[in-house]
Amino acid sequence: AAERGITIVPEIEMPGHSEEVLTAYPELSCTHEPYKQADFCPGNIGTYDFLENVLKEVMDIFPSHYIHVGGDEAAKKSWGSCALCQKKMKELGIDHVDGLQAHLISYMGKFLNEHGRQLVGWDEVIAGNLSKNTTVMVWRGTELAHEAIKHGYDVVMSPGAYCYFDMYQDAPGTQPVANGGFIPTEKVYSYVPGSDLPEAERNMITGVQANLWTEHIPTPEYAEYMLYPRALALAEIGWNGTKTKNYPEFKTRALAQIEHLKAEGVNPFELKKEIGERKEKMKPVQHKAVGAKVTYNHAYNRYYPAAGEKTLVDGNMGGWAHGDGRWQGFIGKNCFDVTIDLGKSTKISSVGTDFMQSSGPEIFYPSQYTVSVSEDGKNFTQVFDKKYESSKEPILDFKTLAWKGSKTARYIRVQAKPSSFGGWLFVDEIIVK
């Protein structure tokens, strides 16, 4: 690879995402038991010895100047009760377990520097006291790029909304299994790295990166299918930056490149046969509750607000992706409970709620759906209540659960319970006819 101008950057995850290590070496976890957790024990001196030895072997194999240590999504649940972790916190003078991760990453950064290498980590590593030659890969949001740049770190932009190529690239029913979500080639091409950063900070962005996580990628051919032509779009962003974009012109060139790739034995997605976005998203739906007042008896999750309190009655259906700004997320016991005020007594014949199932991010259909009606908003009559068997299949699907009948009411209360194994409920519209 090096002879061909390609740098392979190895990634060794720490302190989280380490289930396989702690199954083989349970003594490096806080519990000392296999299959109990995914985090190294940062209070155990053996953890540092082990990771140093692993990194030495990695550096022997890989000539890359950059070594990626992960640093993302550590649960840290056991650190607060672990005697070794508590002892380490006291020694370091820190009062929160987050400081333990910062210490471990900083320690490993210095170790790599001593061996002539530079640390790369996901944006969670920003909290550490790292050397200025650190590179941060930002996957969560531009505000973290701003934070990293403020610390003097180089930044690689890799936001999940544009750069996660394990997501579907076309209508899910027509595609092999993917990790939920929807990122077509056109969306990748639309990405402008650091678009809401000051120009001086944008100049600190080293580049962009695509991620193809392989939980659902069983073969090299399928990996090629998920990579191309989306990788072509991201590559053009990498060298074209914020210059004027012209997707139709790019698509023409991409179609030609797809034929070239096929001639070379590569297995790309056939962009010319693309179906595109969910058809329900493309045209507003009219119904009797559009614009009505909605009272949330249980709040939506702040990370998935969509359009706020007007979301469920704005006439706008969601697309293939739960994070497209049209889907509202709910989590917890009895988490979906809203009351719609139609403004006056109204004849109604159906109340349907559109739900998503996307098992990758643990979004499931509800296990129970209930509809009640009222004239005064206080005394409700239940008109529909049905339980449903929970399943983690299909991977991505959409379903409208509905009551049908004949009633006259001003207020409609709609409730849904999460699946029998928990997870999220995602809703885009309550359609009243």
Task: Go through the PLM ranges and name each one.
Residues 1-117:
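Substrate-binding cleft of carbohydrate-active enzyme catalytic domains
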Residues 19-24, 79-81, 147-148, 167-168, ...:
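Short, solvent-exposed loop/turn and secondary-structure capping segments
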Residues 48-56, 106, 146, 225, ...:
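Amphipathic, non-transmembrane alpha-helical secondary structure
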Residues 119-134, 140-284:
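Flexible, acidic glycine-rich loops studded with aromatic residues
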Residues 282-317:
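Predominantly extracellular/luminal regions of secreted and cell-surface proteins
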Residues 319-384, 395-433:
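Aromatic, loop-rich ligand-recognition surfaces of beta-strand-rich domains
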Residues 389-395:
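Short proline/glycine- and polar residue-rich coil/turn motifs
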